[in-house]
Amino acid sequence: MTFDYDLFVIGAGSGGLAASKRAASYGAKVAIAENDLVGGTCVIRGCVPKKLMVYGSHFPALFEDAAGYGWQVGKAELNWEHFITSIDKEVRRLSQLHISFLEKAGVELISGRATLVDNHTVEVGERKFTADKILIAVGGRPIKPELPGMEYGITSNEIFHLKTQPKHIAIIGSGYIGTEFAGIMRGLGSQVTQITRGDKILKGFDEDIRTEIQEGMTNHGIRIIPKNVVTAIEQVPEGLKISLSGEDQEPIIADVFLVATGRVPNVDGLGLENAGVDVVDSSIEGPGYSTMNAIAVNEYSQTSQPNIYAVGDVTDRLNLTPVAIGEGRAFADSEFGNNRREFSHETIATAVFSNPQASTVGLTEAEARAKLGDDAVTIYRTRFRPMYHSFTGKQERIMMKLVVDTKTDKVLGAHMVGENAAEIIQGVAIAVKMGATKKDFDATVGIHPSSAEEFVTMR
């Protein structure tokens, strides 16, 4: 049987782009379908615009810090329209850049929403295409709980397009998305209230990270309301009235309500049932992400239909952009490059671009103790005020932590809260991934004076 394409990719996000270009480099005839801007969640409504907002949110604090170093800085004022417009322009520039990369790689871009007709046929609009192999890389989307007035809430998709800066933003959700935007909006000058079901934010992260970030956020003026859930949202003359579950908790009045309670795989209307593609049982809990309708795959990203594959957030393995890229490239290498290989999901570094920032790689203390036993784990921890703040008058702190296997001396995890955490942990992650021991860390000469040197001087 002959096909229109060797590979048809549904979704031009990080995973789909990486897989399509890699497959084309091996000589495969490849098409990719996208019904939005090319680039996916990361480029269009995730990592990239969010990080630009993070950068923008740092300037008020920098202006304050400058005074401690003798600089005289005038009154700072944010031009919100300029800020948001600049972010949108950069997003669109990057989207066009990815289109040019596809053209250079020889991948055909088809605009429109793709659905599966059967295991070898995809329909886009009124056109049908056949392919030997199909890759699903449609990512995920935010989900809102079903509560009265939830239509007044926005998600992380819409926050990048607010016409005016909120005076007061209320955020429901204490995962990395809600926590990051709490820091961003507070840094930009908005009043921020974050509502969390548990007693702490960032469930699943190391306990010291959770404690340190929550304390730092509170010190920065963010109001965190623990052990509460939103019960209703109502539009009132003053803005949005947000009712909470706590008996003694007064309703919150805010002008913007951000819903950051989770994401789900974006498979609605994809036609999985037409192609015999199975999904994961929704009773299985994923890592901070709903597994409802996540596509089930094996170690080679192969679905229940042997010629159909899936990568990225739609599979709910580890929902990070570099992971989707790695999965996509591993798939292409295996199926078109004569290099069958798995993508390892072990020991992957990640960051929370909150304020204060956090980054982590490897096992948390709780995970290590559960795996090896309480007596088999040694913890090294330090907490200090960085030199930068010698003149600022601020009580900012950095926390660093190593989780070590007592018997083998192997470093199982590294965690950090504080300025430049992501940049520092990226380097530390190489050592942890390679199996470095605490003795290896101790034998490394630190760069002085730096915050990073504390990772090799902890005793």
Swiss-Prot record:
The gene is gor. This is Glutathione reductase. It comes from the Bacteria. GO terms for cellular component: cytosol. Disulfide bonds join 42-47. Homodimer. It is an enzyme of class 1 (oxidoreductase). Glutathione binds at residues 14, 329.
